[in-house]
Amino acid sequence: MQEQYRPEEIESKVQLHWDEKRTFEVTEDESKEKYYCLSMLPYPSGRLHMGHVRNYTIGDVIARYQRMLGKNVLQPIGWDAFGLPAEGAAVKNNTAPAPWTYDNIAYMKNQLKMLGFGYDWSRELATCTPEYYRWEQKFFTELYKKGLVYKKTSAVNWCPNDQTVLANEQVIDGCCWRCDTKVERKEIPQWFIKITAYADELLNDLDKLDHWPDTVKTMQRNWIGRSEGVEITFNVNDYDNMLTVYTTRPDTFMGCTYLAVAAGHPLAQKAAENNPELAAFIDECRNTKVAEAEMATMEKKGVDTGFKAVHPLTGEEIPVWAANFVLMEYGTGAVMAVPGHDQRDYEFASKYGLNIKPVILAADGSEPDLSQQALTEKGVLFNSGEFNGLDHEAAFNAIADKLTAMGVGERKVNYRLRDWGVSRQRYWGAPIPMVTLEDGTVMPTPDDQLPVILPEDVVMDGITSPIKADPEWAKTTVNGMPALRETDTFDTFMESSWYYARYTCPEYKEGMLDSEAANYWLPVDIYIGGIEHAIMHLLYFRFFHKLMRDAGMVNSDEPAKQLLCQGMVLADAFYYVGENGERNWVSPVDAIVERDEKGRIVKAKDAAGHELVYTGMSKMSKSKNNGIDPQVMVERYGADTVRLFMMFASPADMTLEWQESGVEGANRFLKRVWKLVYEHTAKGDVAALNVDALTEDQKALRRDVHKTIAKVTDDIGRRQTFNTAIAAIMELMNKLAKAPTDGEQDRALMQEALLAVVRMLNPFTPHICFTLWQELKGEGDIDNAPWPVADEKAMVEDSTLVVVQVNGKVRAKITVLVDATEEQVRERAGQEHLVAKYLDGVTVRKVIYVPGKLLNLVVG
């Protein structure tokens, strides 16, 4: 064994061994308990970042630990390979998205191997290959036949210059992010999957997810947004149709003083024919991108349509306004306004001088003061005719019943959740498998024409999708009739909604899933990824699992038993102000810093001498140039050091502050482990451990070893507090470093301790542990070694600490054998100088003894 720890030599050797032996490849084995450990698959952007490294290290630690428990562990990896960034990169680099993507996959695969992750590479998949997306296309056609897929026209952000649809986040200050053209709202036909048909089940089954973070479950509950209320129909004078609104507060209905409709509502459109002001307002709304988050804060605007609706209970005429806070996509495109008891309605009514009618009493029973704001709390009704005096619940039911009896109301359960729009007008995605025949019939692509393959050898102009630009691509024949293929592609959330199931049978050619393999491995035992995926990906992931269950492919209700959301990785951020006042961000690697005595940064500059402004720790990002390249760190310190720091610096679900001093500390620790094993093995073979022959000191050290095994097992397995597990191993290492190594049993005990330490560290730092296990002559490869088991007998304390009091005051603390008698404890106490001093020349009148804890001598 060489004396120095050289990670660059051992890591590549160990990785080659894993590759050649196919160590982490697994198959179904009914005789073993399975464990499916999965990290969210990466987008092949070109290089791994520290967020990836943290996510995958957590997964690898859990997978390796479960494997050492003797389980059949599946840990696969793949590539979420479709998506918009590839199109931008292709245009920029004058290539096509496919070669750019495949090059990135090859590069990042090497980076993953360099970090020593124990993946089953035989199951690797890339979602941009026809072998993968063909089954997604087939499944979509089956959902269409079941009535779960439909096409409808819906409003999108449209860039007239690029001739493309933009996501909300691609619209900046009302303009296209790419060409700065003013964005328009445009109605275009799109494909939807009916996730709303599963809304109740998606909501109710959250209660089954005992091992998912409450924050994620709450976010999903709010996103699904189930509410109970009443749908109310209004007659509108001089208008051919009724107006329908939905409310969760029918108790306030007598205070409804106006209605508001979306700018795109047919009533507003009709009114605009003779109202130029309204027509201009509708035009303004059409070109305003409205994301839900922005609606709460934006200025509320409106125009009176001139139409009057009739309040069904009071018979009063109330105005109908077009307002920018009502969206056609939500509900009926019309809302009832109760300005006395809803703050948004109050602000709008105050702005435009509309009637504000209070109908709920304040908590003290007085009429509410509405001079400053609405009263939004629930309470007792007044000013409401026959409903006066009713509380919220009674009024809700009484008004709902009355409206229902009159035929103008209906109790309804509503959801905030909308059906999933899966159409994208982009090129780099899976083609949607639908065709339109010459006679206008729309139908799924026949099975014998699947997969609909996306051509990869294309020229990108950065504006139009190549399959939209090429009229020949869309032409096909169905049932002997000319037809046109759909040129939209799937939302990339489609691919990431079922990949976890395809990992169980990546080579299966008879269908989407091999049910036998899928049901052996599923559900996933632990799924690891960022909390930013709480509502989109993790909701679609659950939805797809239920769709596959209802298609008979899987037999479980939920895709993953446990969800672990790792925290973000933060790093120092620095900038200097340029000549034009702009901020130039400088990488923390290039910052030369001065710190105060507490280690805080007080001054910084870069190599060029610029004075740097330190903005604190923030999430690693390109925009702040504060990302740390994992590859550089691995080359500098080794993969094991990077992995150990990642797991030690912070609890897995909390933010991690990147500190190179911490990385250096992790590296020093591994050098100490190496040194101790080197010194131990240099002394030659070791005798067998004779537990009965150990001295008290040796027993105490062995007790520490086995207590550490018990703690680390609990920390990794049950608590998943990996940082405290590492801290416990470090503490034990400090004791081992000071332990005597001369006697035969000293060395035998050290052998037992080091074999345990190396196995406990193995999930975190597998390369060094693989090597040290061999040097310690452990049996076989450490990858097949069992997890160490704590010896209960060794952990039993044979001595205990007893507090000695004289007349209730503590005079000494003594160590006695656990089974010592009261007499023996008294005798031992009497040997203590301070106790003897207070007993001198006095009589012990009473003895209070709590075995193993307390001895109180009452003297007088």
Curated annotation (Swiss-Prot):
Subcellular location: Cytoplasm
Motif ('HIGH' region): 42-52
EC number: 6.1.1.4
Catalytic activity annotation: tRNA(Leu) + L-leucine + ATP = L-leucyl-tRNA(Leu) + AMP + diphosphate
One GO MF term attached to the UniProt entry: ATP binding
Motif ('KMSKS' region): 619-623
Aminoacyl-tRNA synthetase in keyword set: yes
GO CC terms, sorted: cytosol
Keywords assigned: Aminoacyl-tRNA synthetase, ATP-binding, Cytoplasm, Ligase, Nucleotide-binding, Protein biosynthesis
Alphabetized CDD domains for the sequence: Anticodon_Ia_Leu_BEm, LeuRS_core
Residues bound to ATP: 622
Alphabetical GO biological process terms: leucyl-tRNA aminoacylation
PANTHER family: LEUCINE--TRNA LIGASE, MITOCHONDRIAL (PTHR43740:SF2), LEUCYL-TRNA SYNTHETASE (PTHR43740)
HAMAP family tied to this protein: Leu_tRNA_synth_B
Family designation: Belongs to the class-I aminoacyl-tRNA synthetase family.
Protein name: Leucine--tRNA ligase
